[in-house]
Amino acid sequence: MKKHAYLIMAHNNWKILEKLLILLDDKRNDIYLHIDLKSDFIDFSSKVHNANLFIFHEIDVRWGDISLIQVEFFLFKTAYCKGNYSYYHLISGSDLPLKTQDEIHAFFDAHYPTEFIGFSLGMTCDNRINKVYIFPKYQRIKNRYGNKVLCLLRSFCVFLQNLLNYNHYKLKDKLMIGPEWVSIT
């Protein structure tokens, strides 16, 4: 039996996450759930009866920060070390499958070993990665004036880099923009 690993990153929408876990609860699936360290820990173990559920509450995740990538690597590495899966699906805790588990497994069996990674045609991230953006971890702080000061500092920093024609990365390959959610072998 080919098993799938669902790697879920969650931080809120607990009712939707609960529904997601119920919909993924299938003996052909293992579920790796990371709940953001800033969020209250909720034990969803009682909601899953057929799949193996592994819950982690370890990393403080910030939007636009390296911590997002750290959680992704953590989930991929943990799942890879625990089992041999035909597919690894990285999804958010706010996603819900549109098909049944039988239909999902049949689709991926028919398309194995195709990698499903999205990107946007004609859009690159060159303008975003060529500059250094300061204080990404503090993108949203609670102090209104602090937010304005940080925003001005970031804007000024990018302005100076443009003025000096500074290029942080000199890449020959073109990097594309796309979603972080994937289904890979």
Spans of model-derived segments:
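ER/Golgi luminal nucleotide-sugar-dependent glycosyltransferases, focusing on the catalytic module
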Residues: M1-T185
